[in-house]
Amino acid sequence: MAGLKYWVWLSEVKGLTNRSKLLLLDYFGTPENVYYADEDEYRLVEGIEPRQIALLAEKSLENADRILGACSRLGLRLLTMQDADYPMRLRNIFEPPCLLYVKGQLPVIDEEVAVAMVGTRKASPYGIEAAEKIAYGLCKQGAVVISGAAAGADSASHRGALRAGGKTIAVLGNGLDIVYPAENDWLYRDIAASGALISEYPPGTAAEAWHFPVRNRIISGLSLATIVVEAPEKSGALITANTALEQGRDVFAVPGPIDAPLSRGCNRLIADGAAGLITDSWDVLREYEAIYPHKILGERVELPRTLGYQAREEQARAKQAAAEEILSLPTLNLKTNDAGLTDDQIAILRTLKDGALQVDDLIEKTQIPTRRVLSALTMMELEGYVEQGSGKHFSLTVTLLEE
């Protein structure tokens, strides 16, 4: 436990990016060594900026001790990236989380046929039923289902997995002591009992809109494959799909009606060849049967007729959740820079304030080299500050504050 407080301290240094934390760990070896280093030693780390060195001068462990106390009371486990049971699949992604909080029993992910299921929070009855049925089939056939416990397709995926008596893992964008959405209290309990809830955010961290695109890299990173159940053209589920592709993982999508707005994202993934078309769980699992013959239990399974009966009720809840999300559009204060943005990122955000722009326009307006613009956009898309739309136009997903 003594060593864990340094992991918590490093993970909670305000304004320090995940990339910077990884650079420090790579240089110093352990967070304890990072803690006891001085400013001269920090300057030796390539990629660490003077502003970040000043942040590391704050050596109080009071917040870390408070978080560890909360974890003890809540029965949470802390998993660091240097622990032997930290999943290798996750360790190998771009910018893995340094620290994870875990409630429940996390299976040995590297030995499992873990499949992520994502989709819109405003899922239609069609999407809800598809999510439940596919998740049910996956778990009955020996897979582990990973999702985000959000309203809509996520919740339906977890329900299907639980109905099958299988293991399911929820990756949250908030602390494990906070239920979001509130009506998923029972779902949280059932997931923790049969699998695990995990988060890179400590107890007490509220659900913020920009947390969710960041946590998506964990959902796909833990998984062999990602299934997009239902997604419109600008769905966060498509960010997860793109992240999965960048991680070298397989992507599948459930096709929908050609005139259904909620299926346009899935249909586009399939049409572009970015995702394989599936209609049931076996369409996914047969890809891994030869590699995991001891895990995959058979071909198709018989589905209970009652699967999907909650679809319309879930749709109503999803609409309410979506409305609440719009009302709580996150803000980003550029003056205080609590998010730890680089100068390049701040310049790009300010340039996008007047409207969406393509990369070439951003390079011209900011006079920042191409490589740095692309790097900054990638990081900000992962953090949920910008999104890429049609025609490769980038736009803001936050409200900028300058006060």
Regions found by a protein language model. Give the residues of each.
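Short, small/acidic-rich helices and loops at N termini and domain boundaries
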Residues: 1-84, 269, 385, 391-392, ...
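Glycine-biased, small-residue-rich flexible motifs in mid-sequence functional cores and linkers
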Residues: 1-4, 80-403
